[in-house]
């Protein structure tokens, strides 16, 4: 039953109070574990992402060490079921392209077409995950347009499929974007203690870190959380919605 393999879980957490969010990222990923049991990972600014195969809990003996080694007040994380690409550590997420880390929940069906737009890359579409191709295209669009919002408004027209992304930039900002059709769920929450913002696939991850649900991320919305607090913009004005009914039955 192919659809079961199309759900991953993403999370992005930022503490304006300079609290180490890594233990929270791990708790959130454990709460999202039912969305992907193949691999998991997390990323902080200016460091290669940490990626592991299997369940989050299988690494519980290393949690303390990971929290110390990757200590950061901003991070993103991912639990994976493979959609396109091989089930190995290389295709596990978050992925890092230049100075942007990317975690993706969804499926992009025109990978080959999209990869033709990505010039001078070192992979062939056969071994590239859909996320890698989208991330490389996005980074080249950011280089041309200077802004993530403008890049997403172009990418959404080039890409066929569904997406919820969390991004992390090396200048220490967490971003979240939900596709214009709202096919995949995305919610945001806040925790007073440490002034922590969280964006994630499901409210279970918000409860897991002791935060409160604030609202759904609107389809076509890009959220940025940084030292300047939370900013939001729309990268799409498409009003057609197409929620995945499978999400409601399987993950609710």
Model feature map: region roles:
Residues 1-252:
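Conserved short alpha-helical segments that host acidic/polar catalytic motifs at enzyme active sites
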